[in-house]
């Protein structure tokens, strides 16, 4: 951003009074532009013990497998965003969602929130951002997973299945910082 979002004047990079970080500040109207992390939200949808994955039709990681997920939109909760992304990417209805994994990814300026949910009626299809969608048994997951947060979520799920069986309500919330 080179220009003020409020008045259009050229913004300067400086440390505002009372702050400790350099930010873009408008010298004309004093508007401070804060760049904050983006929230990515999605679901780990389960049907008959199998996990719904989508093969990406877009970059980044075109052709790799991922959970249905995407950027949170203004005005929606993380849970609503996760359900929406599942509908958009996998033409699926996620129900009974609850927060399952939360990842801080500071080097990308992102937070990933994945909800554990049930796949309604086992129905799904490929949305416009997916080449295909498929159900996988935890023991049969593909090795070409798109993102570290997805791989870690799938690993947590496999361990929780081994520990708690199919009692999804017993699965704990996992919180992790990804640094690489």
Model-derived features with residue positions:
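Active-site donor-binding loop signature of nucleotide-sugar glycosyltransferases
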Residues: 28, 56, 69, 117, ...
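Beta-strand-connecting loop/turn residues
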Residues: 22, 48-50, 122
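Short, highly charged C-terminal tails/helix-capping segments
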Residues: 171-175
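Conserved Nudix-box catalytic region and its N-terminal flanking loop in Nudix hydrolases
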Residues: 46-88
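Acidic, metal-coordinating catalytic segment for phosphate/diphosphate chemistry
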Residues: 1-42
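Short connector loops at helix/strand junctions that flank enzyme active sites
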Residues: 21, 38-40, 46, 60-62, ...
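Conserved hydrophobic "DFG−1" position in protein kinase catalytic cores
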Residues: 45-46, 53, 117, 135
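Unchanged
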Residues: 72-156, 160, 167, 178-180
